[in-house]
Amino acid sequence: MTIDDRGQIRSARRIVVKVGSSSISGENAGQIGPLVDALAEAHGRGSQVVLVSSGAIATGIPYLALTERPKDLATQQAAAAVGQNVLIYRYQDSLDRYGIVAGQVLLTARDVENPTHRSNAKRAMERLLDLRILPIVNENDTVATHEIRFGDNDRLAALVAKLVEADLLVLLSDVDALYTKPPQESGAERIAHVGWNDQLEGVEIGSAGPSGVGTGGALTKVSAARQAAEHGTAVVLTATSLVVDALRGEPVGTWFAPAQETAVESAPAS
């Protein structure tokens, strides 16, 4: 189905949710529980849910006795190898409360670009969803190199949404929406709705926080949202703390209308 407004979110067949490193690692690791609560609620309504989760490298950093994100590729790969294991354990531990089983899917850019690999990935994802498994997707940082990386999981999330033909993509961040200028500045206004042909210039989404563990920003999120919308997937960009409201169709964050949408959302900005 094509979702033309937030009121249809509760009946979405397939939903992809993307969460960034800074939202679920370090001092924010406790947000995994509430995030899973929201995913489980949507799953319980009958929606097929896919989670695209960053955080392998960031989660692995303290286990390697490092104090900051490593700059060299080999140490990044080592941190990812350790962190991905811990991250999946944390998700499954939380999902156990709902009797939901997670399935780990690790992809590289080549897996999506190569037709044979893409077909295999799609088949596996389709089967997982048919079995009511909740796929948790991440870039395969342990084998990815600088030349074949997605660069950020916002782009990966858009590609996954296309791969599984999702009705909705929810891009989670540290702030609640796109703004006309940095949200901490006076006069900043939330952008509640972005139509397919709307031009976005000078928008802000705020910083990723002081941790420096993520790789995405406003431009990557807008680009990913546009990419998903181009293929008929509605997009909500909002804060991780608002994921429950977003998946209930509440007027939070910024709504990106899918390409074939004709109706304009009437919810006022706040």
From Swiss-Prot:
Its EC number is 2.7.2.11. InterPro entries: AceGlu_kinase-like_sf (IPR036393), Asp/Glu/Uridylate_kinase (IPR001048), G5K_ProB (IPR041739), Glu/AcGlu_kinase (IPR001057), Glu_5kinase (IPR011529), Glu_5kinase/COase_Synthase (IPR005715). GO terms for molecular function: ATP binding; glutamate 5-kinase activity. Keywords: Amino-acid biosynthesis, ATP-binding, Cytoplasm, Kinase, Nucleotide-binding, Proline biosynthesis, Transferase. Pathway: Amino-acid biosynthesis; L-proline biosynthesis; L-glutamate 5-semialdehyde from L-glutamate: step 1/2. GO terms for cellular component: cytosol. One of its GO terms (biological process) is L-proline biosynthetic process. Belongs to the glutamate 5-kinase family. Catalyzes the transfer of a phosphate group to glutamate to form L-glutamate 5-phosphate. This is Glutamate 5-kinase. It comes from Leifsonia xyli subsp. xyli (strain CTCB07). The lineage of its organism: Bacteria, Bacillati, Actinomycetota, Actinomycetes, Micrococcales.
